[in-house]
Amino acid sequence: MLLAAPGSASAAASPSPSATPVTYKIGIGQDYDGMNPFSSWSGISWESFRLGYDFLTWYDEDYQPAPDLATSWETSPDARTWTFHLRPGMKWHDGQPLTARDVAFTYNLILDTQTPAYIQYLTGVTGVTAPDDVTVVITTRKPNAGMLALYIPILPEHVWKKVDPDHLDTFKNMPFVGSGPFRVTELKKSKWVKLEGNPDYPADLGGPPAIQALYYVISQNTDSMIEDYKAGNLDAIVDFPATYEKVLAAAPGTTAVAAPAIGFHELAFNCWSSPKSKGDPLLRDAAIRRAVHWAIDKEKIDATSMAGQAVPGTSLLSPAEGAWHWDVPAADQYRYDPEKAKQLLEDAGYTDRDGDGVRENAGGDKLEFRLAALNEYPEDLAAAKMIVSWCRDIGIKLNLDQKDEGAFGDEVYDNADYDLFIWSWGGDIDPGFMLSTFTTRQILNWGDSQYSNPEYDRLYVRQAEALDPSDPGDTSKRKAITDEMQKILYRDDPYIVLWYNVNLQAFRTDTWRGYDQVPAGNGAPFWNYMRGTYTGLRPVSAAATKPGGLPAWLPVAAIAGVAAAIVAVVLVRRRPRAVEDA
């Protein structure tokens, strides 16, 4: 079964009341941005949702659809009616029963409000009903190729029915009520997120976790975080700069991995043509975007800012997504060629008319733009500085603006107040979500390049419906369409994919066992879309659960009595809204 854990979970998870809680702490450089699944976008928030909520279906370790709330399902002969059978006896964290009504409520809430956070998953869905407590029936206008990849946390109707549908994205969602193996119980901005194990989690989904208190410990100082890890005050750290990987690998009792991951780091352009856009209108010209692409040396970025650990990017979907990645033919790939970049700009009418080194258009508007990069990600800042230099060489002036991630998220998603930025995506296992972020309906929502292309929009609908009822497992038709969509994006350059994500994680193997590395053997144990590590970890000895030294950046009073241990991270970006943090 999915998420099966070794050993006896119930015995490990039920110590006497006086025993020290079994505690695990994970160090991470990114802060959370709330616990509202309709508006939060940070990696910590979404890893908490994966642990705190259940989903209709999930994935096995080969990233194939597998049971979660639903134990089985079948389709009608025309693949337009899907019937899901839920596991009985599931409960919410507050003890209320979880039934098919909650699933239907969640999906219908999304359909009724058309919330951009999830509506792309329900493309073509015409109805969701719950004929009884353990049956969900979904009907679609046409076959839906992503029906087993609905990345939508199932919400408790008895909590969310009280929320004004027009203000879903401002609900704090604390106390947190989910059904997963962990429950979010405490938030301390810029300090930590605390989750507690669910003692009632079903055995066939991994059972109650042995970890009773799980902390994501937040630090903006990589050096101090690594020193605390080496001192035994943290059990794992994640998403650290690539230059630290060898240092951590040499630490006693440590395994360090640099595993290929879904997603990428990108240079994005503000392509929005609306009068509301606050981006420079010159960037709507694809010739400028293509010239910038030719001016970038991705191999040097990898060698310099990623210590050679990453793979330079080409098409949108990463190689970690298997067959969905479009392998760009060698003859069509952008290569570092500043002379070609200059010629593209010349041909498009951009010349240096006043001799100051910056090109202008015929009207005298200079190719001078803002480039935002985030303080939280030193590898992005390093790449940004190189890109500024390369663009200067071809007559484009970029003014580097270092930002904090939280404030910058508001500028991008709520106001479109930017020209270019470097940031990252985690993506989904199924290609539908990532491709949806370039559809017109996602402008000022997930679509942070504000890109619009009617041809691309039509292809998005076609790929979602590319399911052969006679052979639902055949993805060849959908693959052909998603390849075409990636070709369009590679041609139009709303994004320049700089490099594909690498899961950089270090974790203690001398004090903990049960790490579930995905892919098996050399993959990452955390941020791998699986819950197996969280439900399967067991302390090697009582020493692993004793209170240890405190991370240097945390106040002692705030974490007194908490034992040492943590989990790992690959950041997933999600759409922000005006959610107040606890």
For the regions a protein language model found, what residue spans apply to each?
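N-terminal lobe/hinge region of extracytoplasmic solute-binding protein
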Residues: 27-77, 108, 177
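Surface-exposed binding/hinge segments that line
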Residues: 85, 119-162, 186-188, 304
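Extracellular/periplasmic solute-recognition and catalytic clefts
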Residues: 110, 127-129, 185-196, 215-276, ...
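A structural "hinge/loop" feature
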Residues: 29-49, 69-71, 96, 118, ...
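Ligand-site clamp/hinge motif
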Residues: 170-173, 200-247, 383, 388, ...
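Gly/Pro-rich hinge or "lid" segments in bacterial periplasmic/extracellular proteins
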Residues: 60-64, 153-208, 213-215, 223, ...
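Detector for C-terminal structural segments
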Residues: 188, 192, 197, 260-265, ...
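Alpha-helical secondary-structure segments
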Residues: 25, 99-106, 133-139, 180-181, ...
